[in-house]
Amino acid sequence: MNPLAPVLTIDGPSGAGKGTISRIIARRMGWHYLDSGALYRAVGVAASWADIDTSDASALVRCTFDTHVQFVEQGESMRVMVNGTDATDELRLETTGALASAIAAIPEVRAALKERQRAFRELPGLVADGRDMGTVIFKDAPYKVFLTASAEERAERRHKQLKDKGVSVNFDDLLREIMARDARDAQRTVAPLKPADDAVLIDTTGIGIDDVVARVMDLLPVPAA
């Protein structure tokens, strides 16, 4: 970790566009990228593979330390390796997202992952995508953004994404899952989902990716040539 490296935090609920926007900006700036949600999902997948009960906090903490996560860029996409296995597709499942949300509510797990996330802070800079990047992990980040969108729009985006991948899912079920996750994330006692006091709020409902990227880029220094 390099405390001198600038950090842009992009927080927000599931489906607000954090991942897409963060990856684009990281490429444009030439900065490192942290998908904190993928870390929680990776621990969830590893725990599932090991048949660990999500109520067993001590076992989950051990799993957190034992799980090796690697981000591998493939063209425009990012593959996530969990203990040497490509778990990208499994990490994107709604069931995995729900599992990650449940695990994220456990204080011991969040504490175990805190330093692993901070270790991504290196020069020339870092774009950190998550739910508590600006409020907990990188409180001193000079650039903070909170993306949001209506639950309906986020469900529509996710529904289209899954449909394009050939995955059949009921829209109403998807909407209910997203709303339930929103409630869990906002109501947990440790690091609840909320914008940092100094974050710039951007509602992406009805706004294209290019427009959102432009708004965020306006907050940052001119990228190095």
From Swiss-Prot:
Disulfide connectivity?
A: none
What keywords sit in the KW lines?
A: ATP-binding, Cytoplasm, Kinase, Nucleotide-binding, Transferase
MF GO annotations:
ATP binding; CMP kinase activity; dCMP kinase activity
Gene Ontology cellular component? cytosol
Where can this protein be found?
Answer: Cytoplasm
What are the recorded Gene Ontology BP terms? nucleobase-containing small molecule interconversion; pyrimidine nucleotide metabolic process
Classification via CDD domains: CMPK
The chemistry this enzyme catalyses reads: CMP + ATP = CDP + ADP; dCMP + ATP = dCDP + ADP
- Give residues annotated as binding ATP: 12-20
Q: What's a Pfam family this protein contains?
A: Cytidylate_kin
InterPro entries registered for this protein in UniProt = Cytidylate_kin, Cytidylate_kinase_dom, P-loop_NTPase
Enzyme Commission code(s) on record: 2.7.4.25
Asked if the record carries the keyword Cell wall biogenesis/degradation, the reply is no
Q: Does the keyword Kinase apply?
A: yes
Which EC class does it fall in? transferase
Write down the PANTHER family for this protein, in alphabetical order: CYTIDYLATE KINASE, CYTIDYLATE KINASE/PANTOATE-BETA-ALANINE LIGASE
Q: Name the family the entry cites.
A: Belongs to the cytidylate kinase family. Type 1 subfamily.
State the protein's name.
Cytidylate kinase
Organism of origin:
Stenotrophomonas maltophilia (strain K279a)
